[in-house]
């Protein structure tokens, strides 16, 4: 039973991945002009024909389209995602490096956002309509309405420039050139980006948790708990929280996956050398292989997040078995 | 509806309508042509230029006004497409159920694993589309979420008694879907429209901020981008940097308030004790 | 006659809604004596559950409650919240409606019962667990040791009902409220639950809320019939359920399958704007002119038998 489900899931994920790869392939073919024109815009006119031929051969442009597609597909699966135009190294390598740096700010921000969002959202939902709830809700709506790039800019200006508390960008001071990377220095640089990312994602978690709690608070078993003589805080903590958090798991795992691209604005403004910044550079320089790679990584992350959510949920909800079509 | 709810609704609608008016009346309100060179570059606000000028000596105030058009267009057009598509597919999928529903949901499942934002980025980089195309693209890619939402409501409606009754009278499927299911789904679709509009506006401006998007159109995102790139932070060119950001935030807020207020009205979650 | 365990005097419960004030209980006077089972019979929407919730103060915060509810001499409605919490579960137990949704799906059945025990009796977890298993056994759940570790969704409707009963009895309260315990159960399970209650009710006073007349007949010593938020008949169950005084009660009995299944015409009245005069008059076969304008009081029609009807309240 479980095995069949897992296989089905993997197959769907495989299909999703293939489709992403296919879309990329089609995009290449549909490009106005041909591939070479995109790559070697200026040199093309000056490239001697045998260079052009060699180029075509290396990139398999001289083979029938279907064969190209299959080769492309195979490459994608093997991690052979081509070479970055900007960095001249394998796409996967450069993505891997930058991904680490994104994690440095993303993981703390997301973790904090989840904890804070769950805590505050639960309380807000439990005390629906109270002054605290209304204040929090309006506050969160306000923060969420601010575009992330604007928020980042404002934080940079206020804390970095006017209050001069934190560095204006980058991940290390120039001192790193001589004395190497100091973790404390990196931490200091990371504060503002983490703050921005946190502010942006906590609103989402808060909203979801509050909604979840609103539904849980109205359930019959909460009345049962009151009828037993339990006090409100205990009921919130023991009975309501656990039930309200169940739908959160799926939401949060999926949210995590989308955060990578969400960080593009934050990283660009704070000059933080992570995946977001990489994406920006790739866009600027139209580094197609790199962009493809980023798209694929993102797809992979979403797929992994989906499967993780599916597998975790049955572990925490006793009513659900793996494969219940959650 | 409580008084405070009414105030919020009125305020947000007022703001949205003001923006619409500004967008429509832009040629008449803006003192200068947004692309024209008028006087000295990077000059602070004065009587001639209420918000100063940018690096190309263009009047920022005029650009701010003209920028409303791009923002509203992307937001509303994109949202309209997303909601119409999403609702349409959702109704069909939920109403017919069975194989059609399965097939559609499978496709949506796979489609949703593809990250929309990176795809949008790549598409806009390589096609350098005008803002209409961007709006359409966003609408298309953004419709998937709506399908799920609408479909779940339609599922419960499709088996409701009044639908079975109408079927028993011999009504055609399209009639039932249009006359009976659609009106019931409209409130939900309406709320989705408001939130989608907000979302797309933010993304649209974001694209401008990243330097993608239509360069021929005045775009608040581009303004912010150019401002920060020209050292607005260091040089303290607040009149260039801040107004576009505020403009976006305000319309975004108005839409959010509107959306939440409507959502609360539609989904009463207060559970009345059974008597 | 001993002093009443529970005395309800002039209870009015109202819910403010956008459409007006819902008068779920309109001046209810009721007494429940030690070791008696009082059956409370009424249709859906008559105000039965509201009554039970009011006793334990489990209604929504914006509910308007007036009157007195004296339990062992103390007015429950004027107790501070932390005192009320000591009453809930320990002195007064309740078996809520809808057993399926009244149990927390993410905790084991044993845990939920044990929780009541640890709360009021301060036992350690292991002793509380043992007691929970004992209680499951007392409500006749087979293999209680294993079942205590089960989750609510793994239990059938009848078993969930028993779990709720066990939970209500956990601290051996002297007063139990049972809200429609046989609702939604098949005939066989219904009989089993009724049997169980026969045992349970022996040692305590019970307010047995139901619309199942058979259950009331089997378990209740006295019955009260509630209609549109008012008590309209009260008396010995044997008498009321065979020779009812009030036309509504008569109608209820006649609507039973074995008595001919003749439903009462019309539908339950609005609690926001109840009918003037006698609230049952719009649907009553014997309604006369004064029924529509005069509001009858609850008068004695036999020894310990009361009815609220103009038939008995004319001059």
Regions found by a protein language model. Give the residues of each.
Chain C
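Short catalytic/signature loops enriched in Gly
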Residues: 4, 145-146, 234-315
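Conserved ABC transporter NBD signature motif
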Residues: 64-75
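A short, proline-enriched helix->beta-strand linker immediately N-terminal to the Walker B motif
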Residues: 170-174, 203
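Catalytic Walker B motif of ABC-type/P-loop ATPase nucleotide-binding domains
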Residues: 176-179
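P-loop NTP-binding/switch modules centered on Walker-like glycine-rich loops
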Residues: 185-260
């Amino acid at each position: 039973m479980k095995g069949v489900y897992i296989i089905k899931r993997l197959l769907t994920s495989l299909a999703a991945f293939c489709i992403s790869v296919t879309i990329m392939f089609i995009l290449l073919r549909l490009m106005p002009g041909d591939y070479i024109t995109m790559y070697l815009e200026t040199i093309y006119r000056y490239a001697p024909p045998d260079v052009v031929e060699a180029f075509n051969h290396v990139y398999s442009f001289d083979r029938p389209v279907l064969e190209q597609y299959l080769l492309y597909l195979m490459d994608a699966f093997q991690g052979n995602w081509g070479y970055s135009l900007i960095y001249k190294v394998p796409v996967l390598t450069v993505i891997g490096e930058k991904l680490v740096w994104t994690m440095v700010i993303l993981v703390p921000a997301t973790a904090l956002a989840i904890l804070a969002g769950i805590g505050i959202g639960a309380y807000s939902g439990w005390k629906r309509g109270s002054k605290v709830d209304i204040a929090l809700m309006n506050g969160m709506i306000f923060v969420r309405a601010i575009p992330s790039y604007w928020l980042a800019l404002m934080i940079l200006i206020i804390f970095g420039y006017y209050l001069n508390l934190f560095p204006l960008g980058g991940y290390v001071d120039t001192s790193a050139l001589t004395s190497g990377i100091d973790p404390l220095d990196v931490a200091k640089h990371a504060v503002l980006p983490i703050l921005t990312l946190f502010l942006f994602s906590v609103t989402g978690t808060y909203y979801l948790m509050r909604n979840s709690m609103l539904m849980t608070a109205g359930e019959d078993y909460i009345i049962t708990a009151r009828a037993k003589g339990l006090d409100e805080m205990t009921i919130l903590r023991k009975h309501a929280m656990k039930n309200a958090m169940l739908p959160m798991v799926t939401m949060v795992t999926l949210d995590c996956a989308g955060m990578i691209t969400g960080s593009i604005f934050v990283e660009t403004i704070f000059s933080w050398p992570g995946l977001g910044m990489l994406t920006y550079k790739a866009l600027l320089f139209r580094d197609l292989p790199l962009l493809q790679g980023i798209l694929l990584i993102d797809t992979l992350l979403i797929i992994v997040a989906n499967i993780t959510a599916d597998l975790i949920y049955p572990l925490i909800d006793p009513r659900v078995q793996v494969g219940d079509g959650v | 509806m409580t008084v405070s709810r009414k105030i919020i609704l009125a305020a947000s609608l007022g703001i949205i309508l003001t923006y619409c008016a500004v967008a429509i009346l832009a040629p008449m309100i803006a003192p200068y042509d947004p692309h024209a060179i008028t006087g000295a570059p990077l000059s602070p606000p004065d009587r001639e230029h209420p918000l100063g000028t940018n690096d190309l000596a263009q009047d920022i105030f005029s650009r701010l006004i003209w920028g409303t058009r791009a923002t509203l267009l992307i937001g509303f057009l994109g949202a309209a497409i997303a909601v119409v598509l999403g609702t349409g597919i959702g109704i069909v999928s939920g109403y017919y159920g069975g194989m059609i529903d399965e097939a559609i949901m499978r496709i949506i499942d796979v489609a949703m694993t593809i990250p929309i934002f990176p795809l949008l980025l790549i598409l806009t980089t390589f096609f350098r589309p005008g803002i209409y195309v961007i709006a359409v693209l966003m609408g298309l890619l953004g419709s998937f979420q709506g399908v799920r939402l609408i479909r779940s409501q339609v599922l419960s409606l499709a088996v409701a008694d009044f639908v079975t009754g109408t079927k028993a009278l011999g009504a055609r499927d399209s009639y039932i879907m249009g006359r009976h299911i659609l009106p019931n789904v409209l409130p939900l679709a309406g709320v989705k429209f408001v939130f989608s509009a907000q979302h797309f506006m933010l993304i649209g401006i974001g694209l401008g901020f990243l330097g993608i998007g239509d360069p021929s159109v005045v775009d608040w995102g581009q303004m912010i981008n150019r401002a920060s790139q020209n050292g607005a932070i260091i040089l303290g060119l607040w009149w260039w940097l801040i107004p576009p950001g505020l403009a976006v935030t305000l319309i975004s807020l108005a839409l959010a308030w509107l959306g939440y207020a409507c959502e609360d009205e539609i989904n009463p979650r207060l559970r009345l004790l059974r008597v | 006659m001993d002093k009443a365990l529970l005395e309800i005097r002039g209870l009015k419960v109202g819910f403010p809604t956008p459409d007006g004030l819902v008068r779920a209980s309109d001046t209810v006077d009721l007494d429940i004596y030690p070791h008696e089972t009082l059956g409370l019979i009424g249709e859906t929407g008559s105000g039965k559950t509201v009554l039970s919730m009011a006793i334990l103060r489990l209604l929504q915060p914006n509910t308007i409650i007036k009157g007195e509810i004296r339990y062992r001499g103390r007015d429950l409605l004027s107790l501070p919240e932390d005192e009320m919490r000591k009453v809930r579960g320990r002195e007064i137990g309740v078996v809520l409606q809808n057993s399926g949704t009244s149990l927390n799906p993410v905790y084991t059945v044993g845990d939920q019962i044990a929780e009541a025990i640890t709360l009021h009796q301060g036992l350690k977890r292991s002793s509380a667990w043992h007691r929970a298993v004992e209680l499951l056994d007392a409500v006749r759940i087979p293999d209680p040791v294993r079942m205590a570790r089960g989750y609510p969704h793994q239990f059938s409707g009848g078993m969930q009902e028993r779990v709720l009963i066990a939970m209500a009895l956990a601290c051996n309260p002297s007063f139990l409220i049972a809200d429609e315990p046989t609702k939604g159960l098949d005939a066989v399970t219904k009989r089993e639950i009724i049997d169980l209650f026969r045992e349970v009710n022996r040692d305590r006073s019970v307010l047995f809320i139901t619309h199942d007349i058979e259950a009331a007949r089997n378990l209740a010593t006295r019955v009260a019939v509630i209609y549109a938020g008012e008590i309209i008949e009260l008396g010995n169950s044997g008498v009321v359920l065979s020779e009812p005084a009030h036309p509504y009660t008569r109608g209820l009995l006649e609507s039973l399958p074995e008595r001919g299944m003749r439903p009462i015409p019309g539908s339950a009245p609005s609690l926001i704007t109840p009918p003037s005069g006698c609230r049952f008059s719009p649907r009553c076969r014997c309604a006369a002119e004064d029924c529509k304008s005069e509001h009858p009081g609850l008068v004695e029609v036999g020894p310990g038998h009361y009815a609220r009807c103009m038939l008995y309240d004319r001059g």
